[in-house]
Amino acid sequence: MEQYRDVASIPGIEITSREGSHILVYFYQHSQLKKFYLKYIKPFLGRDVMSSTKLSMEEIVHCAKLFPSVIIFPHPYCVAYTGVCNLNFDDFRKERLLEAVDGVEVINAENIHRWNLRCALLGLQLRKAITGGSDGHSLYHMGRVVTYAACEKTGPAMLNAVKDGGACVVGREINLLRKVASSGAKLNVHAGVYPGRLGKNIRYSYRVIHVKSALIRQQWRLRFYRRKNRYHPLV
């Protein structure tokens, strides 16, 4: 981008935490992004570009806050654990994380429509900054979802608009066939991360089974208690 100074750009990075969830950090200057990456991310990064870090989500947020930045949770609700609203984070931890960041992504072109609706509702409830993104891994995706604001055509001005709640989001999801093709292409290019990703999938599946089983047991206990005390309203 240094060759095209007349094109407004925003330096940013998407990071995968130790838990497997994603976070976006946007910076006001390229030098800030470079320093953040070299000092706080690269030493804890796996060998592949798609590898997760060894840092927890809280540690990443803490490091990002050391710089002038805008911190966003992308696709907070999605199919697996890449969004922060998943079973790897209990309610208390999730609430603390959502309080710590600047905002959430409310429309993601690669996400499923019903999950985007939940993301949009979350954004309204939090009353924080909102963004949208194409999650573009090919030219077809670019521009499917955009974030816009009435501000100067500079990166810092756009970041300020987002942070101050002056940004709007418009767009729609790509079709299912395109989603499948995009996911397949990413897996082929980054096959080296399969072992780590498989491990995360297994751990998350175990977590889902554990939580769902506990919920079912709780519901059965409650049903049994109500049936047992049906004729004893004072008990």
Where are these regions (language model features)?
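Histidine/acidic-residue-rich catalytic or RNA/ligand-binding cores of hydrolases
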Residues: 19-24, 82-92, 114-117, 139-152
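Acidic/histidine-rich catalytic cores of soluble enzymes
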Residues: 104-113, 122-123, 141-142
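Residue-level recognition of alpha-helix initiation/capping sites
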Residues: 55, 113-114
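Short, aromatic/basic amphipathic alpha-helical patches
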Residues: 1-3, 118-122
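Short acidic/polar capping segments at secondary-structure boundaries
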Residues: 76-79, 109-111, 137-138
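Extended substrate/RNA-proximal surfaces in nucleic-acid metabolism proteins
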Residues: 1-105, 201-234
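C-terminal functional module detector
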Residues: 58-70, 121, 126-129, 134-235
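Structural recognition of alpha->loop->beta junctions
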Residues: 87-111, 147-163
